[in-house]
From Swiss-Prot:
Annotated positions binding ATP: S272, G372, G373, E374, T375, G415
Keyword entries, A-Z: ATP-binding, Carbohydrate metabolism, Kinase, Nucleotide-binding, Transferase
Gene from which the chain derives: otnK
GO molecular function, one term: ATP binding
Organism of derivation: Brucella melitensis biotype 1 (strain ATCC 23456 / CCUG 17765 / NCTC 10094 / 16M)
Biological role stated in the UniProt entry: Catalyzes the ATP-dependent phosphorylation of 3-oxo-tetronate to 3-oxo-tetronate 4-phosphate.
Protein name: 3-oxo-tetronate kinase
Catalytic activity, EC: 2.7.1.217
Catalytic activity: 3-dehydro-L-erythronate + ATP = 3-dehydro-4-O-phospho-L-erythronate + ADP + H(+); 3-dehydro-D-erythronate + ATP = 3-dehydro-4-O-phospho-D-erythronate + ADP + H(+)
Family: Belongs to the four-carbon acid sugar kinase family.
Lineage: Bacteria, Pseudomonadati, Pseudomonadota, Alphaproteobacteria, Hyphomicrobiales
Length: 436
């Protein structure tokens, strides 16, 4: 692909991404910026007259667990906007743990996008080896363990009980799935392209790509660089971005500069119940002020928001910012779901986190570290942030982002991302890379 094909402005965007949740959007945006692509994240489908000057635009939706018809409609609206802005290639982004049951939305949305683009074939690749998500013979692993044997089997919204991505994909879509094995990927991008053509000629609609390591990601990125529609996690997008920037060079510092964290007070809000977030909360509350959200009060007490806000404001003298969390281990989560109902409890918690973020913004807080995709969506919407510029990475797939037109910075973390020290690391990066 010649270097002259790369964009210089809104009329020639390289890549348009449709992400099925907020943290997934910042995840992929962080990898694109990390390869030197100027990237903007827009929260929801923007107005028709919005002008954007970027190499890549990521549109974040809340389409992972909503009704299928809504997910399709919103995804097609995002595609239409990207097409109107002369986007050259399209990427449907979902989680590296796939997060989609047999009644899930990944298959239906993929089918709708293929049909809208007049295409018959695409790839499926949630792999993100740098975070331990690998695919072997079409099976998805997390740190060497089958996905269905990890904590994802207990996910409150999208429990993953089958690790075979081909089988999951076929259960919720209109076509057949095949596999490009790691032995083929080892042979290079030309071999992968040949194998993709063979699968398509056999009537396969979705090619699940094996990826065991970083070299595989780079090979796959080159192999799919000309496909009209690509679907996957941020790993494949990272490989694609590397292929593009090898041709034109990259300036990561310049790409990150627009999203440098603002100065100001910080709060941590954690709604994820993943294994890693439980470990992160435990590590942080051992050294910093932390308050567990009372689920019953979140549901039944309208004045509980005042209690939470007053507690956060009272921690201003502490060396480390305060943490408010609804994070809990699986057995406690199960008890909450049985007592209150999973959807009812989740909705109340998300709403309360949104209210709290809005209240703290009014009190002068400018940095929000948020754990959990649903929580991140609630906080972003409550803060009325329509889009982000993408800043420095805290951990693979988790950058600092800065509100467009608002002096607010957020770190929006998918549940299982980051190390146990993530909450500390996010603050360190903000203090080092923030506005001088």
């Amino acid at each position: 692909m010649p270097a002259s094909n790369f964009p210089t402005g809104v009329h020639d965007m390289r890549l348009g991404v449709i992400a099925d949740d907020f943290t997934g959007a910042t995840d992929i945006a962080g990898f694109l910026v990390g390869n030197g692509l100027r990237t903007i994240q827009l929260n929801g489908v923007p107005a028709d007259d919005l002008a954007v000057d970027a190499d890549a635009v990521v549109i974040s939706l809340k389409a992972r667990s909503c009704p299928t018809g809504q997910a399709i409609a919103e995804s097609l609206a995002a595609l239409k906007w990207l097409q109107k802005n002369n986007c050259q290639q399209f990427f449907f982004k979902y989680c590296s743990t796939f997060d989609s049951t047999p009644k899930g939305n990944i298959g239906p949305v993929t089918d709708a996008l293929l049909e809208a683009l007049g295409e018959e074939f695409t790839v499926i690749c949630p792999a993100l080896p740098v975070n331990g998500r690998t695919i072997y013979n079409g099976y998805l692993f997390v740190n060497g363990v089958l996905l269905s044997e990890t904590g994802m089997r207990n996910h409150p919204v999208t429990p993953m009980t089958d690790s075979n991505i081909m089988r999951v994909m076929e259960s919720q879509s209109r076509g057949r799935a095949g596999n490009i094995s790691s032995t083929i990927v080892d042979q290079g991008s030309d071999a992968v392209r040949d194998a993709l053509r063979k699968l398509q000629s056999e009537g396969i609609r979705y090619a699940v790509l094996d990826a065991l390591n970083d070299q595989h990601i780079e090979t796959l990125g080159r192999a799919v660089s000309q496909m009209k529609l690509v679907t996957g996690g941020s790993g494949l997008a990272d490989g694609m971005a590397r292929a593009w920037t090898q041709l034109r060079g990259k300036n990561v510092a310049a790409a990150e500069a627009a999203g440098a964290p603002v100065k100001g007070r910080t709060v941590i809000l954690s709604g994820s119940c993943s294994q890693m977030t439980n470990a992160q909360v435990a590590a942080y509350k051992a050294k910093a002020p932390a308050l567990a959200m009372d689920v019953e009060k979140a549901i039944n007490d309208a004045a509980y928001i005042d209690v939470l806000a007053e507690w956060v404001l009272a921690q201003s003298g502490d060396a480390l910012p305060p943490l408010v969390y609804a994070t809990m281990p699986p057995e406690a989560l199960k008890a909450v779901q049985e007592r209150f109902g999973g959807e009812r409890a989740s909705a109340a918690i998300e709403d309360l986190f949104g209210q709290l973020a809005k209240r703290l913004e009014a009190e002068g807080f400018t940095r929000f570290i948020v754990a959990g995709g649903e929580t991140s969506g609630a906080v972003t919407q409550a803060l009325a942030i329509d889009g982000f510029t993408i800043g420095p990475q805290i951990a693979p797939g988790v950058p600092w982002v800065r509100g467009i037109g608002k002096p607010l910075s957020l770190a929006l973390k998918s549940g299982n991302f980051g190390t146990e020290a993530f909450f500390f690391e996010a603050q360190k990066i903000a203090n080092q890379e923030g506005d001088k």
